[in-house]
């Protein structure tokens, strides 16, 4: 990945259906939506949201992956911070 393509970082806050944490994480990982193991991560959190997903890359690629995250059948809502 070109260093210029990493210039954008997005924090995607995800609320999922109760009890579906494992299914959601497996879904996201199996679809390859985290592409840079050094920069990107998916953390379970407590509070209004269940996961924080950090995405890095070109804005066009981040947009595409956020749309794919939202397509997960376990997602209730998302908030994205860029």
Question: Which positions does each model-derived feature cover?
Answer:
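A compositional/biophysical signature of low hydrophobicity enriched in polar/charged and small residues
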Residues: 1-82
């Amino acid at each position: 990945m070109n260093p210029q393509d990493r210039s954008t970082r997005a924090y995607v806050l995800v609320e999922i259906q109760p009890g579906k944490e494992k299914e959601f994480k497996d879904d996201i990982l199996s679809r390859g939506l985290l592409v840079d193991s050094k920069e990107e991560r998916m953390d379970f959190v407590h509070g209004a949201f269940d996961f924080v997903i950090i995405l890095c890359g070109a804005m066009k690629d981040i947009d595409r992956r956020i749309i794919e995250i939202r397509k997960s059948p376990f997602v209730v809502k998302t908030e994205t911070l860029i």
